[in-house]
């Protein structure tokens, strides 16, 4: 008899979901994300909001990963933004330091894209604070698809919002953990 695996063998269920994309073009920065949350092969929620304004509305962000973990990180980032007003990069680096060294924060499973009028950044639990080379960056299960689509469109005459919408649509067509229920936030750069 051939071996098989069951959900009992696999450990806790794996949560999947989301694609977050940022595009900076033409004096605007847009972060967009889809609304799907899945556990295993089941869609649990189709209209989750994973993109939001932070601080005083001068920073926007999106997350991929565990929702509670992401909101904890957003709260910590907002505290750092209060400590370092108008300095998103400094606030992000300080959060990344805490994320790597704090015993509680180290267990959080999420990634974030944040942006203000000057800079877009990806923050990871490994302490990375990365700025995109061409104003385009993506995270999450469909991130590579959205990133490829956005890179293909960045040099066209389409604006940042259109590129985000089209790229997330392409990701949703390819990635089973991404849907077409989009949330976008925009800042004038």
From Swiss-Prot:
Protease subunit of a proteasome-like degradation complex believed to be a general protein degrading machinery. This is ATP-dependent protease subunit HslV. It is found in: Cytoplasm. InterPro entries: ATP-dep_Prtase_HsIV_su, Ntn_hydrolases_N, Proteasome_sua/b, Proteasome_suB-type. The lineage of its organism: Bacteria, Pseudomonadati, Pseudomonadota, Alphaproteobacteria, Hyphomicrobiales. Belongs to the peptidase T1B family. HslV subfamily. GO terms for cellular component: HslUV protease complex; proteasome core complex. The keyword RNA-binding does not apply. SUPFAM superfamilies: N-terminal nucleophile aminohydrolases (Ntn hydrolases). Its main location: cytoplasm. Na(+) binds at residues 172, 175, 178. GO terms for molecular function: metal ion binding; threonine-type endopeptidase activity. A double ring-shaped homohexamer of HslV is capped on each side by a ring-shaped HslU homohexamer. The assembly of the HslU/HslV complex is dependent on binding of ATP. Keywords: Allosteric enzyme, Cytoplasm, Hydrolase, Metal-binding, Protease, Sodium, Threonine protease. The active site is at residue 18. Allosterically activated by HslU binding. Gene3D superfamilies: Glutamine Phosphoribosylpyrophosphate, subunit 1, domain 1. Disulfide bonds: none annotated. Its EC number is 3.4.25.2. One of its GO terms (biological process) is proteolysis involved in protein catabolic process. It catalyses: ATP-dependent cleavage of peptide bonds with broad specificity. It comes from the Bacteria.
């Amino acid at each position: 008899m051939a071996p098989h695996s069951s959900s009992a063998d696999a450990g806790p269920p794996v949560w999947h979901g989301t694609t977050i994309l940022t595009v900076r073009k033409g004096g605007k920065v847009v972060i967009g994300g889809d609304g799907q949350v899945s556990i295993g092969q089941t869609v649990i929620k189709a209209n989750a909001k994973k993109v939001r304004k932070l601080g005083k509305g001068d920073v926007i962000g999106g997350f991929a990963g565990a929702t509670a973990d992401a909101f904890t990180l957003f709260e910590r980032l907002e505290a750092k933004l209060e400590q370092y007003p108008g300095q998103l990069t400094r606030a992000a680096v300080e959060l990344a330091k805490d994320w790597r060294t704090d015993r509680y924060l180290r267990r959080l499973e999420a990634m974030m894209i944040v942006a203000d009028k000057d800079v877009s950044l990806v923050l990871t639990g490994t302490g990375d604070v990365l700025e995109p080379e061409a104003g385009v960056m993506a995270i999450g299960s469909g991130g590579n698809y959205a990133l490829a689509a956005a890179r293909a469109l960045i040099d066209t005459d389409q604006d940042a919002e259109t590129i985000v919408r089209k790229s997330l649509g392409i990701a949703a067509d390819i990635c089973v953990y991404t849907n077409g229920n989009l949330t976008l936030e925009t800042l004038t750069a």
